[in-house]
Regions:
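Flexible, surface-exposed loop/linker segments and immediately adjacent secondary-structure boundaries
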Residues: 1-75, 79-156
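Long, low-complexity or tandemly repetitive, helically biased scaffold regions used
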Residues: 111-266
């Protein structure tokens, strides 16, 4: 699975065997493919464009609705709207992608202040949740330090130790990863919006008298702490997966975790 926060990802997937699959996941949709050459584009506006040169891409939104992108038909999704198909000749795909992305960026510049206000409000809420969940995980420092030392030595604890440690940490790690999925997307969209803000777009007041300039200064001052915490969460997730047959926490108890996501992939 490839996580797409913003930008463009192009993949050519050869024939896959068995249960293998390739997926691209954004904050609002998932694209599943087999034997396909395709491109997924997502500008800072949150729009999604899926174009397919060959094969087929199944696009699934966050409510489970599906739509297929095939040669001659692209799929797009705008924030708050459903997927829709648009007919486009395969020979014109590259030009269509460039024009589509340029239109989205022009729209963003025209409505930059509204976008900044929206993402700033989400950031404030998710940041509080993220930091609170992180603090809860850090209360398990004895386990985290033990895992880090075992990782340094290239060893694992006994089966009984691992079972006990996973049980103590699984719910905290699951809650944190669930928040992180949303938080990092909001954070990096704001980082992109700052580029346009620095060019003079979207300047104004956000809320309670705070200006956009003050907000981005605060965002920059928090950057080091945010990036460190994100890195720690990914490292702890890796250490957990090493003790759980390569599977990441789903929020279930250790005894129930039979269908966790595979951290290492196929």
């Amino acid at each position: 699975t490839v996580g797409l926060i913003s930008g463009t990802v192009s993949l050519k997937v050869a024939k896959l065997a068995g249960t293998q699959s390739v997926n691209v996941r954004s904050d609002a949709a998932a694209m599943g493919v087999r034997g396909t050459q395709f491109t997924v584009t997502s500008p800072p506006t949150g729009d999604i464009l899926v174009t397919c040169d060959e094969g087929e891409v199944i696009c699934t939104d966050d409510e489970g609705r599906e739509l297929a992108a095939i040669p001659g038909t692209v799929v797009e999704k705008r924030p708050g709207e459903l997927f829709r198909t648009v007919p486009v000749a395969v020979s014109s795909l590259e030009t269509f992608r460039k024009n589509w992305n340029a239109e989205r960026i022009d729209a963003l510049r025209a409505n930059a202040l509204r976008a900044i206000r929206s993402f700033a409000a989400l950031y404030a809420t998710l940041s509080r949740e993220f930091n609170a969940n992180y603090a809860e995980l850090m209360k398990k420092q004895a386990i985290l330090s033990k895992w880090q030392e075992e990782d340094r030595r290239g060893k694992l604890g006994s089966a009984m130790e691992i079972m006990r440690e996973k049980k103590d940490i699984v719910r905290h790690l699951f809650a944190l990863r669930r928040t992180l999925f949303q938080f990092e997307r909001v954070y990096f969209r704001l980082v992109e919006l700052k580029v346009y803000h620095d060019q003079g777009y979207g300047r104004g007041t956000i809320a309670a008298g705070e200006t956009t300039t003050q907000f981005f200064q605060k965002l920059e001052s928090e950057k080091k702490d945010v990036m460190k915490k994100m890195a720690v969460i990914r490292y702890v997730t890796k250490l957990y997966a090493l003790r759980n047959d390569g599977r990441v926490p789903t929020g279930l108890s250790d005894e129930e975790q039979e269908d966790d996501g595979d951290f290492f992939g196929d």
